[in-house]
Regions:
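Active-site anion-handling motifs in enzyme catalytic cores
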Residues: 1-337
């Protein structure tokens, strides 16, 4: 089964969570007899690169990795770009499937396009409910960072507090400030630092402005830790007594490693939706950044036995669901429409 993946997020500035997603997604495909023959990155519009597309006769399945792209489609072109892959598949007589996606606050036009997909799999029940409101059914399988077991246990020795960043830059700066104030370590979810765009690209004022903003953000809340591999980030998270974060994939890694955490919501309610599915409710959600992170704060946020039991059950269910999903979508590739 020859699979073409679109919205490959592994090149996303060394984003640890996206790296794990892609590793696990490819592993799932291979474990169920598929072969990835083509990968298209998240930051390029496939519609304007026809000369870079594969020979479609050599592709049996188009798999779209939704992640956090499909939200606010009326104002965000990236959501519609992915949704239009359904029509491409129809024109080439290749099944198209959406996996590992959040759906939030999208317009009717996006769901009309998703209706051309052969199947939809979303990361939480809230996303499935939005799809149903537009007449579409979607299976629910939690994020691909959770698709395989990680060899850590809740009983391992832990020490200190770790802070990560947020998709909201102002929140990242405040988290970095609190980490310094608390004597804690701060690690962004990305492994790379802003690079000078090069002399050819400085002719573009927009590129220079983008680099300058990234450079100033790095100066404002640069990392105490920055790892070269996602596995190192997982180990860092798993070594802490508490993580304070504004990142969805930091929360999934906290679940994976059973590391206590509190969070500030991301650019959509995807963290809250995930944790409601786990059974943890909203108890770990912060509405404001705390003024202090002391021993009393840390102690009251340690997982209870009931919470650990819910996380364990959720992880087992997610892994089983991920394998069922992989098997189902690869069976679709066996018969072209």
């Amino acid at each position: 089964m020859r699979v073409a993946i679109f919205n490959d997020t592994e090149p996303d500035a060394g984003h640890y969570g996206c790296a794990i997603v892609m590793q696990n997604l490819i592993r799932l495909i291979e474990d169920h007899g598929g072969t990835v023959v083509f990968r298209w990155p998240f930051n390029k519009d496939w519609r304007t690169h026809a000369d870079h597309m594969p020979d479609w006769r050599e592709v049996d399945l188009i798999l779209v990795n939704g992640e956090g792209t499909l939200h606010h489609s009326d104002t965000r072109k990236n959501a519609m770009i992915l949704a239009e892959l359904g029509a491409l598949g129809r024109s080439q007589h290749i099944p198209v499937v959406l996996v590992n996606s959040t759906l939030y606050a999208n317009g009717k036009a996006l769901y009309e396009r998703l209706g051309q997909f052969h199947s939809l799999s979303v990361r939480d029940e809230a996303s499935a409910a939005e799809a149903r409101s537009f007449g579409l059914e979607a299976a629910v399988v939690a994020d691909m960072t959770l698709a395989y077991e990680w060899p850590l246990s809740a009983e391992r020795d832990r020490s200190g507090v770790g802070f990560t960043d947020s998709v909201h830059h102002s929140v990242s700066a405040r988290l970095r400030s609190l980490a310094r104030q608390s004597g804690a370590s701060f690690c962004p979810m990305v492994s790379t630092v802003p690079r000078w765009p090069g002399f050819r690209k400085i002719l573009s004022i927009a590129r220079v402005r983008k680099w300058l903003r990234a450079y100033l953000r790095e100066k404002t809340y640069g990392a105490d830790n920055r790892f070269s591999a996602a596995e190192q980030f997982i180990e860092w998270v798993g070594s802490k007594r508490l993580i304070v974060t504004g990142r969805y994939h930091t929360v999934t890694i906290c679940l994976l490693t059973k590391t206590p955490f509190v969070y500030l919501e991301s650019n959509t309610p995807k963290i809250t939706s995930l944790l409601r599915d786990v059974g943890l409710g909203d108890s770990r959600k912060l509405t404001n950044i705390p003024s202090v992170v002391d021993e009393a704060f840390i102690s009251q946020l340690q997982f209870t036995e009931q919470e650990i039991s819910k996380i364990d059950a959720f992880l087992v269910s997610t892994r089983a669901g991920a394998h069922r999903m992989a098997e189902a979508v690869l069976q679709q590739s066996a018969v072209r429409p």
